[in-house]
Amino acid sequence: MAAMTVHLDIVSAESKIFSGRVVSLQVTGSEGELGIMHGHAPLLSYIKPGMARIVKQDGSEEVFYLSGGILEVQPSTVSVLADVVMRAKDIDEQAALEAKRRAEAHMANAGADFNYDAAMVELAKAMAQLRVVETIKKNIAR
């Protein structure tokens, strides 16, 4: 029997990154981890910066970094809309480490007019990219 699938579109501000049938999607929503499969109840949620993992019809997995965004689940279609989407293999680990270092330095040297929220957002994005890179490294090592 064929696996039950749902159509998934992952779209960034620049282009459509993925479009196809998937068995499952895992993302971090505003209220925690979400696992989306065929038959999931309709849902609209914010997505936190982090990893999106999909399992395709053939059983293969693909991992993406999302800068945050919106998830919409409908009976036959799931849509992920994000400002920035990167395939895990395309993440520059050194650039993410540098962004993390810069955000931490800004926070440590904060003045009276410092925008703490913006620094926390930048730090969260850099940390999320690094978590995606680490996940890929662990999966390759297996």
Curated annotation (Swiss-Prot):
The keyword Cell membrane applies. Gene3D superfamilies: ATP synthase delta/epsilon subunit, C-terminal domain, F0F1 ATP synthase delta/epsilon subunit, N-terminal. InterPro entries: ATP_F1_dsu/esu_C_sf, ATP_synth_F1_dsu/esu, ATP_synth_F1_dsu/esu_N, ATP_synth_F1_esu_C, ATPsynth_dsu/esu_N. Keywords: ATP synthesis, Cell inner membrane, Cell membrane, CF(1), Hydrogen ion transport, Ion transport, Membrane, Transport. It is found in: Cell inner membrane. It is a peripheral membrane protein. One of its GO terms (cellular component) is plasma membrane. The keyword Transmembrane does not apply. CDD domains: F1-ATPase_delta. It comes from the Bacteria. GO terms for molecular function: ATP binding; proton-transporting ATP synthase activity, rotational mechanism. F-type ATPases have 2 components, CF(1) - the catalytic core - and CF(0) - the membrane proton channel. CF(1) has five subunits: alpha(3), beta(3), gamma(1), delta(1), epsilon(1). CF(0) has three main subunits: a, b and c. Produces ATP from ADP in the presence of a proton gradient across the membrane. Belongs to the ATPase epsilon chain family. This is ATP synthase epsilon chain. The gene is atpC.
